[in-house]
């Protein structure tokens, strides 16, 4: 059965189709005969309890520089849609949170993927703390003294904003680095929220693995290796993608968290693993499926739509 699918995303003109997961999901939906609609989060509205968006009919093509066509914008009641993909990138701020409140009003009659209430209640750097034995030593605080004590305990640490994304604002403070005090001052000025400190994992030099799970089951993995001059492995900031397979420890991690992901209705999730430790659970807009398909032929977009269609 053909579905009406609205994609809530950053504007389609801004995506890099070579590595964009939302684009891959849209291509697969179109291939299956589903009707695609596009809208940016700032086109979402609610009036008198009716949730709507100014949507444009969308066609996509796997052609750089000519990857989309949009129709004329039309205000549509989103209950007319069968599926909405919640796919705009973080930051996970009040704008983002407000969209989850609005979309929650129409879910699950209109299937919102991922479930907007659970997306709101599962920020990736906090959700992961539900599994403390699977992650490195971690501190969430805005108290500078707590961070300095943590640094004295572990020497090398990572300091990053609690609601950042794409590697922005991530700092490696090696033992003896004298920048911690000034960094804490800067973080206090830039961020109203607490920030996060973690024990530095030296295994990151060998890569930070992104594992994709569909309905709580691992379906593919990608290793991201940082450059020689950067502590971050995110592909947005120059991390090099490499083909990878799951280790026994990574399968153990997936088996532990899988039931919780299914219980919360998370269809598409990406987790980050360094060595033996999980560092994040990404439920907002996980990436990596295009790279995985290029490396080993696994069509994760097809597995995603199989899971979505089974719910319709």
From Swiss-Prot:
Q: What class of enzyme is it?
A: ligase
Asked if the keyword Transcription belongs to this entry, the reply reads: no
Residues noted as binding Mg(2+) in the record, renumbered to the chain: 280, 282
Tell me the domain of life: Bacteria
| GO cellular component terms, semicolon-separated | cytoplasm
Give the keywords, sorted. Answer: ATP-binding, Glutathione biosynthesis, Ligase, Magnesium, Manganese, Metal-binding, Nucleotide-binding
Q: Which InterPro entries match?
A: ATP-grasp (IPR011761), ATP_grasp_subdomain_1 (IPR013815), Glut_synth_pro (IPR006284), GSHS_ATP-bd (IPR004218), GSHS_N (IPR004215), PreATP-grasp_dom_sf (IPR016185)
Q: Which residues form the ATP-grasp domain?
A: 125-309
Entry's cofactor comment: Binds 1 Mg(2+) or Mn(2+) ion per subunit.
Reaction(s) catalyzed by this protein? gamma-L-glutamyl-L-cysteine + glycine + ATP = glutathione + ADP + phosphate + H(+)
Look up the record and name the pathway of this protein: Sulfur metabolism; glutathione biosynthesis; glutathione from L-cysteine and L-glutamate: step 2/2
Required cofactors, per record? Mg(2+); Mn(2+)
* GO molecular function terms noted in the UniProt entry: ATP binding; glutathione synthase activity; metal ion binding
Task: Quote the EC number.
Answer: 6.3.2.3
Residues where ATP binds? 151-207
Q: Which family does it belong to?
A: Belongs to the prokaryotic GSH synthase family.
HAMAP family tied to this protein: GSH_S
Instruction: Identify this protein by name.
Output: Glutathione synthetase
Q: Which organism is it from?
A: Brucella suis biovar 1 (strain 1330)
Starting at the broadest rank, the lineage of the source organism is: Bacteria, Pseudomonadati, Pseudomonadota, Alphaproteobacteria, Hyphomicrobiales
